[in-house]
């Protein structure tokens, strides 16, 4: 019975649709479709009706009885071709079918009745599943009321959005009538409604694309905990949704703050201001605007944070320059120097040069401010053979006591230190075995001696300003130290001993100028230091800044006096 009815229904509806098209002038064709897979009806009219239905549910429920009697045709049973009147045997089924779970609005034989039924809203959930159901009185009995398919979820989100918009328009209309529409209240309420509308739209988009929304990631990948922004401008910028712009602004903000910290921290090189090398590399790669090339292999695992804060703004050349030149002046074991320390800053910003000079001055004065009697800090760091020769050189303040072997205990006199030079055991300050190819071709000893003599004469005749004077004296010493490990002749000892003697007078003059800085550095560097620790025979010297700065030497005392 169902098949012939379906076939006759299809033909019957075609005839009704054509006749109704002639009758309607503007409204359009009736939207009643067969119960099979149906094309989606016009959403414009239905959406408005659905909105009114979503807001006014009373109007939706008020006509349950009307629908059963209003439609002469039976819902759920299409009429046959010949008879405009419904079949008498099936007439008693009209009232229960009107309240059943499945309702189908079909045009009746009359001209006005089908037009009225075609304009009634249809259930969007039923339409998603190929069924056309009149929405009036259908909400409670919809078969797909709790369906969780993608189409039905999209319908729910659309209904929420439309309901929020309708509520906003109604509230604005009532406020305009009462004359209470203040701008502040409007903005607050509008923000609330927009916030309600925005989240469902994201959910609807995710439903359309076939996936659920992912929880929002933490800032910068979630792997890097960052301090909050430091300015009101950045806090306001965080309100925008542009993540790339936020990253750029945050990077600029952190650079400005780090430059301020650098200018404050560069006053003293404290031993505890150290950062592990891997942390520095990851930090630099995370915040640098351009891809950063990894540091050269002659850099060790530790870098002072005072230098790190500026290395990320300059190129690799400036980074090597600042680190190597400061290490020449202060003998930081963390900077194995390459032969490129003669290079001066490239065409970078002026802040690099100023920072370098300030770091050089402060680091040099901090080494000169060492008190007698301070102890070596022992650590289990091993001496690496691959370090370059300049790393193992001490500045001219040590007065030639550059070769320090492992003995049962450290002797504080200069003669004892020089007497143990013949011990074959290697120490932290002994020349390393050069098992790597030199970066730059080594010059002859005569050429280097000539350069040393020339620099020493210029340094004696024309005393440089306060910033440049320490570097030139140490620059001179380092050139002599370069030739020592390579030649390995008795002349090495003579070169080490002669150079400090030549520049002792210059250093004494410098120390008189640095008196005010020495007092300040001495207070900060030796607050919690102990005295009297001795070295064991088998424990190597540490390559940390603490061990260098806590060096007890009568030579340093003699020079500083």
Curated annotation (Swiss-Prot):
One of its GO terms (cellular component) is nucleus. Residues 13-26, 44-67 have a biased composition (Acidic residues). Expressed in testis, kidney and skeletal muscle. Residues 1-119, 414-435 are annotated as: Disordered. The keyword Phosphoprotein does not apply. It comes from the Eukaryota. Disulfide bonds: none annotated. It is found in: Nucleus. The keyword Metal-binding applies. GO terms for biological process: embryonic skeletal system development; myotome development; positive regulation of myotome development; regulation of somitogenesis; regulation of transcription by RNA polymerase II; sex differentiation. Residues 123-170 bind DNA. GO terms for molecular function: DNA-binding transcription activator activity, RNA polymerase II-specific; DNA-binding transcription factor activity, RNA polymerase II-specific; identical protein binding; metal ion binding; RNA polymerase II cis-regulatory region sequence-specific DNA binding. Residues 68-84 have a biased composition (Low complexity). Residues 32-42 have a biased composition (Pro residues). Pfam families: DM (PF00751). Coiled coil: none annotated. InterPro entries: DM_DNA-bd, DM_DNA-bd_sf, DMRT. Keywords: DNA-binding, Metal-binding, Nucleus, Transcription, Transcription regulation, Zinc. Transcriptional activator that directly regulates early activation of the myogenic determination gene MYF5 by binding in a sequence-specific manner to the early epaxial enhancer element of it. Involved in somitogenesis during embryogenesis and somite development and differentiation into sclerotome and dermomyotome. Required for the initiation and/or maintenance of proper organization of the sclerotome, dermomyotome and myotome. Homodimer. Belongs to the DMRT family. This is Doublesex- and mab-3-related transcription factor 2. It comes from Homo sapiens (Human).
């Amino acid at each position: 019975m169902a098949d012939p009815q379906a076939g006759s229904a299809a033909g019957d509806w075609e005839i009704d649709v054509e006749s109704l098209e002639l009758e309607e002038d503007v409204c359009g064709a009736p939207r009643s479709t067969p119960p099979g897979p149906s094309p989606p009806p016009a959403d414009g009219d239905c959406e408005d009706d659905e909105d009114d239905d979503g807001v006014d549910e009373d109007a939706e429920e008020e006509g349950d009885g009307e629908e059963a009697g209003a439609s002469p045709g039976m819902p759920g049973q299409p009429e046959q071709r010949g008879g405009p009147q419904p079949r008498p045997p099936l007439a008693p089924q009209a009232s229960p079918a009107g309240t059943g779970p499945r309702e189908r609005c079909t045009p009746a034989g009359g001209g006005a009745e089908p037009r009225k039924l075609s304009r009634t809203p249809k259930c969007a959930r039923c339409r998603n599943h190929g069924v056309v159901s009149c929405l009036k009185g259908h909400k409670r009995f919809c078969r797909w009321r709790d369906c969780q398919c993608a189409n039905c979820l999209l319908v729910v989100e659309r209904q929420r959005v439309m309901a929020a918009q309708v509520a906003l328009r109604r509230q604005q209309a009532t406020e305009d009538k009462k004359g209470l529409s203040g701008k502040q209240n409007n903005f607050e309420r509008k923000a609330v409604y927009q916030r309600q509308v925005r989240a469902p739209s994201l959910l609807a988009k995710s439903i359309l694309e076939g996936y659920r929304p992912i929880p929002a990631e933490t800032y910068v990948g979630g792997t890097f905990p960052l301090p909050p922004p430091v300015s009101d401008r950045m806090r306001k910028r965080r309100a925008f949704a542009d993540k790339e712009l936020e990253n750029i602004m945050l990077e600029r903000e952190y650079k400005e703050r780090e430059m301020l910290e650098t200018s404050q921290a560069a006053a003293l090189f404290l031993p505890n201001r150290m950062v592990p090398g891997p942390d520095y590399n990851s930090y630099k790669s995370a915040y640098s605007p351009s891809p950063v090339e990894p540091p050269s292999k002659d850099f060790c695992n530790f870098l002072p944070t005072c230098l790190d804060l500026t290395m990320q703004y300059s190129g690799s050349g400036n980074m090597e320059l600042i680190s190597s030149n400061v290490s020449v002046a202060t003998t930081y074991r963390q900077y194995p120097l390459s032969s490129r320390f003669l290079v001066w800053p490239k065409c970078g910003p002026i802040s690099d040069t100023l920072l370098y000079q300030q770091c050089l001055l402060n680091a040099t004065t901090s080494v000169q401010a060492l008190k007698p009697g301070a102890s070596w800090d022992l650590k289990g760091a091993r001496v690496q053979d691959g370090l370059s020769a300049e790393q193992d050189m001490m500045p001219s303040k040590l007065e030639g006591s550059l070769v320090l072997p492992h003995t049962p205990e450290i002797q504080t006199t200069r003669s004892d230190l020089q007497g143990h030079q013949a011990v074959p055991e290697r120490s932290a300050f002994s020349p390393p075995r050069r098992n790597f190819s030199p970066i730059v071709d080594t010059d002859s000893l005569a050429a280097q001696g000539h350069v040393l003599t020339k620099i020493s004469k210029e340094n004696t005749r024309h005393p440089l300003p306060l910033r440049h004077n320490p570097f030139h004296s140490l620059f001179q010493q380092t050139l002599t130290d370069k030739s020592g490990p390579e030649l390995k002749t008795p002349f090495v000892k003579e070169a080490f001993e002669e150079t400090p003697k030549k520049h002792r007078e210059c250093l004494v003059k410098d120390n008189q100028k640095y008196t005010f800085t020495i007092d300040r550095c001495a207070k900060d560097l030796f607050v919690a230091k102990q005295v009297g620790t001795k070295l064991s025979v088998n424990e190597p010297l540490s390559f940390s800044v603490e061990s260098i700065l806590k060096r007890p030497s009568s030579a340093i005392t003699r020079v500083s006096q």
